Every structure is written in structure tokens, then in C-alpha cells.
Amino acid sequence: MSILLKGGTVVSAYNRRQLDIRIDGEQIVEMGANLPVENSQIEDVTGCYVLPGFIDAHTHLELNNGKGSLSTADNFTTGSQAAVAKGTTTVIDMATPNKGGSLKDCLATWNQLAEGKSSCDYTYHMSMIEWKPTIAAEIQEMIAAGITSFKMYMAYDNLRTTDAEIFEAMKEIKKVNGMLGVHCENGDLVDELIQSYVSQGKLTPHYHPLSRPAAVEAEAVARYLMIAEMADLSVNIVHLSTKRSLEAVERARQRGQSVYVETCPQYLLLDDHLY
């Protein structure tokens, strides 16, 4: 028996319309005004907006900080429940291997974390926290397993790779038409600024944004995009947070590069005057 949503306002990227929607299994099979109700489970959604399920393309569920002392607040059970409650029907989690571990083992670990526990659809971006021939050889395996996007870091000592390694990874990812997203910060400068404030005993939240000024992100974004231009790869920038970084993206697009960008609500609503 199909499910018939009646009386709702369907919102798309183009317009809003009063339409009925028929769902069979997990597919929308028909949309139109006053669809027949025979052999249907009717759900009256009059007065409601009907939208496609949202996709949260950047989650960290049950992620350990790599030092064994701290994990993110949500796991696949609680995180997916929170997602569904607000209309998100797919999450793309950041699968992150241990140092020295394989991508294949990481994928198996994340499947074990998620299987039978998630209330919504899920998939992963595969993080590559080091670069070596065995990792390069696994990229094709990840594509075959349905993982088409990868992540690397320019910051955090336990996660970051060098510019040369990012360049080599880009060339391998291009071979399989994959996508690379990178956490863009100048890790050396961040570490130096943090150490400078710590040595002065300046440990309050006020100094957190001072240790990560806009320039350290903008510089890394510009550098990343130059590397991507050399590799001729379409790329993504994760959680972009500053105007100067966006200006670097706009310059790259004017040069003809294909660049995708994500941001987060906190970067749109909060700034450092709060600290």
C-alpha cells in the first residue's frame, strides 16, 4: 500500500506548490493535485511544508580525539535521532582511521558503529591522515565500496599531511573521479600562536580566536586551491569560517576552478566579540 501525503505545500529549489505526494516503498512515485486515494495510507499534511529530506554532509559521530581521552557527544543512535527530528534524513560522517591503520579497516569500524543503530540513511567521507603507497592503493577499493569522497587536514599534529602529500592524493583521487575536502588552517602558525599564549599564561577563551586569526585559514585556503589547480581537481573546503577565505574561493572560481564550499551555522551567527 502506498502512502499519500495530502494537502501540503511542496517546497523545491524552484517554487512552492500545493501538491499531493505518493510514496511507494522509499520512492516518490507521483506528485500532483488531488491524487486518487484508493489503496493508499492517507496522511493529512494540510498546513505543513513538505520538503526533501536534508543531508548533513559533515558529521563527527562517536569520534575519538585520537588521544583516547575525549569523544564527540553523539553516536549513531543519538545523532541520527536528533537529525531525523529536524528533517535530516541522511548524514555523511567523517570516517577517521587510526595512525598506521588501513582505510579498509576504518570503513569496517565505522560500519560496525552505524549498522543497526542509525535512524536515518548514512554514508561516509574517508579521512586520510597520512599518505603512503598502501593508502594510495586503497582509494580504488573505497570507490568500489561506495565511498567517493575523501578528507585531509592541514592542521592538528595527529591528523595533518604535507602539501606534497595532499598533491599526490589529489592526483590519485582525480583518477577515480572522486572528491577531496580539506580542513584548511596553517597548522604551523596555529601551533606557534597557541604556544605563545600558553607561555604567557593566557589560557582563557578570549585567546582562542586570537590563536586562530582569519589569516591562518585564508592562507591555507589559498594554498590548497593553488595545489588543486596544479592537480586539476574539483575540490571542497570544509567548514569555511572567514570572509578572507571566501574571497580566495571567489578568485579561484574566476580562474575557472571548480570549488565547493561548506560552512556551519556558528560561523554565520557568532564571531569573536563574544569571547
Feature map (PLM): residue ranges:
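Histidine-rich, glycine-flanked metal-binding segment
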Residues: 1-53, 67
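Divalent metal-coordination and catalytic microenvironments
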Residues: 8, 26, 47, 58, ...
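Metal-associated gating/positioning segment near the N- to mid-region
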Residues: 48-117, 134
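Short, ordered loop/turn segments at secondary-structure junctions
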Residues: 66, 95-97, 127, 155, ...
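Short, surface-exposed connector motifs at secondary-structure boundaries
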Residues: 87-92, 118-123, 147-149, 227-234
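Alpha-helix-loop-beta-strand connector modules within alpha/beta enzyme cores
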Residues: 104-120, 168-182
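Active-site beta->alpha loop and helix N-cap motifs at the rims of alpha/beta catalytic domains
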Residues: 128-133
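Histidine/acidic residue-rich metal-binding segments in metalloenzymes
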Residues: 134-275
